[in-house]
Design a protein with these regions (language model features):
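Conserved N-terminal beta1-alpha1 strand-loop-helix module at the mouth
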Residues: 2-76, 80-84, 88-92, 161, ...
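C-terminal binding/interaction regions
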Residues: 167, 178-179, 186
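Hydrophobic faces of well-ordered beta-strands that scaffold small-molecule active sites
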Residues: 19-23, 46-48, 75-78, 97-98, ...
Length: 186
């Protein structure tokens, strides 16, 4: 299966939605309920994390289900740390790949399919190296431990073209999110 959505559509939806929910559960019915609730709430980009036994099998079924039940939902795979796992999720229909780290072997796998790869980065060098490898969106992870909103703000000064999302110690409260948004996250 090829990605249902183009790289440009994924990027636009990430910006429009303003957040990418991250979730895993071994119970596919719980996953469906969470995805459906997010979809009904206006979310159009969802990251299913590769954090359990047979997670790829659950993801493959969710892609088929979402195609019918949530046709505008852009599903991607997270917690992808190697090129083989990226290839597996791309074959199952992932529209984007996210990792907790930057693995330069994953970038060409995604780039060949024009599928976004958003690696976790914890320094200006990692962000810059990921961008050089074709990563349009980088993820600061673990954001709260790497330096918080001030880190993002300071990175955006010299690398102002960057598209940065954050995960790890980011809470869904106005008090927590406001400084991140002001710092310039995606």
């Amino acid at each position: 299966k090829m990605a249902k959505f183009s790289k440009m559509q994924v990027m636009a939806a990430m910006k429009e939605t303003g957040m990418v929910p991250v979730f895993f559960n071994k119970d596919i019915e719980i996953c469906k309920n969470v995805i459906k609730a997010c979809y009904e709430g206006g979310v159009r980009v969802f990251e299913f994390t590769n954090r359990g036994d047979f997670a790829h099998e659950i993801f493959g079924e969710l892609v088929k289900w979402a195609d019918k039940e949530c046709p505008e939902m852009i599903l991607g795979a997270g917690t992808v740390v190697d090129a083989g796992t990226a290839s597996l999720y791309l074959q199952l229909g992932a529209n984007f790949i996210v990792g907790p780290n930057f693995n330069p072997d994953i970038a060409p796998v995604c780039n060949r399919r024009l599928v976004p790869y958003s690696p976790g980065c914890g320094s200006v060098t990692e962000i810059n190296n990921a961008q050089a490898a074709g990563c349009d969106v980088t993820k600061v992870f673990p954001a709260g431990n790497v330096g918080g909103p001030s880190f993002v703000k300071n990175v955006m000064a010299p690398l102002r073209w960057s598209n940065i999302m954050v995960t790890g110690a980011v809470e869904p409260t106005e008090e927590n999110l406001t400084p991140w948004i002001k710092a310039g996250v995606l």
